[in-house]
């Protein structure tokens, strides 16, 4: 953690909806005139697409499911060094993983490859979005570097529905191919993804109120209006719950550290919660400058 150069980390699995949270933060940054450096977890994958396919096949022959959820498939040591360097001096480096043809045009690299590393500096804060923002293993501890840690954790069936629909629509995969990926990733999901949500400051969990019992045949993703949002705070004593309840219609507290909000109030809830927290980080930063 660094008072002078704060780091915000958004952690969530593939299909969890972390991009939605990133979009809300971008709105806040623009409205509040805050400059942020952005890094994506995909940029720290260890292998490009073709090499990853070869690695998966190689490990499968040994009876091992090798996935992007694992620490071994990612350059987490490099990511930690970026967090540490930004926390010390406000500088760092990142790159982009090119997912599809549209990004290939944008970045000038082939799909499934990485762009060159680029340095960033002169920002108010660093914003990370990806799979491992709070990862802790025997060799790395990313959580210790982050000043605000947020988990995005839909209930598992909803997460799978979102992933299946996204991968089919944007990446051309079949339901069977996405299902195979989900199955291969399950051990790493349990060992590497889930433990991070015990280290976050705030978790957002979308819960559908329609039947999602078989996510592999779901024709539609439940809409925000067909969901509720459970928001858990690690330090509830610092949260103004009466204010949130008054501003978020039909919300209520389910536990002393949790509030339940209608699903279509996600954007408003995040803005009400995050804006004062960001201001606190920047006030602390300015006192240190």
UniProtKB/Swiss-Prot annotation:
It is an enzyme of class 2 (transferase). ATP binds at residues 12-20. Coiled coil: none annotated. Pathway: Carbohydrate biosynthesis; Calvin cycle. GO terms for biological process: reductive pentose-phosphate cycle. Its EC number is 2.7.1.19. GO terms for molecular function: ATP binding; phosphoribulokinase activity. SUPFAM superfamilies: P-loop containing nucleoside triphosphate hydrolases. Belongs to the phosphoribulokinase family. This is Phosphoribulokinase. It comes from Sinorhizobium medicae (strain WSM419) (Ensifer medicae). The lineage of its organism: Bacteria, Pseudomonadati, Pseudomonadota, Alphaproteobacteria, Hyphomicrobiales.
């Amino acid at each position: 953690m660094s008072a002078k150069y704060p780091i915000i980390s958004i952690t969530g699995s593939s299909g969890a909806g972390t991009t939605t949270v990133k979009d809300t933060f971008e709105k806040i940054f623009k409205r509040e005139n805050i400059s942020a450096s952005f890094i994506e977890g995909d940029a720290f994958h260890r292998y490009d697409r073709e090499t990853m396919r070869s690695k998966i096949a190689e490990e499968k022959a040994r009876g091992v499911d090798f996935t992007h959820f694992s620490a071994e498939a990612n350059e987490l040591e490099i990511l930690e060094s970026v967090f540490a360097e930004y926390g010390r001096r406000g500088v760092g480096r990142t790159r982009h993983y090119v997912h599809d043809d549209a990004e290939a045009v944008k970045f000038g690299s082939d799909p499934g490859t990485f762009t060159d590393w680029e340095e960033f500096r002169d920002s108010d804060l660093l914003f990370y979005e990806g799979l491992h923002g709070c990862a802790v293993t025997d060799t790395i501890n990313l959580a210790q570097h982050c000043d605000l840690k947020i988990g995005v954790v839909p209930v598992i069936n909803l997460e799978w529905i979102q992933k299946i629909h996204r991968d089919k629509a944007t990446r051309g995969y079949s339901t069977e191919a996405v299902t195979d990926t989900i199955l291969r990733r399950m051990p790493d999901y349990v060992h590497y993804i889930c433990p991070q949500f015990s280290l976050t400051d705030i978790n957002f969990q979308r819960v559908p109120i329609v039947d999602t019992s078989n996510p592999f045949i779901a024709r539609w993703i439940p809409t925000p209006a067909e969901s509720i949002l459970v928001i858990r705070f690690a330090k509830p004593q610092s949260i103004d719950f009466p204010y949130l309840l008054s501003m978020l219609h039909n919300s209520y507290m389910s536990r002393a550290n949790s509030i339940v909000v209608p699903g279509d109030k996600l954007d408003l809830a995040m803005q009400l919660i995050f804006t004062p927290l960001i201001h606190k980080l920047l006030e602390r930063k300015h006192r240190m400058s």
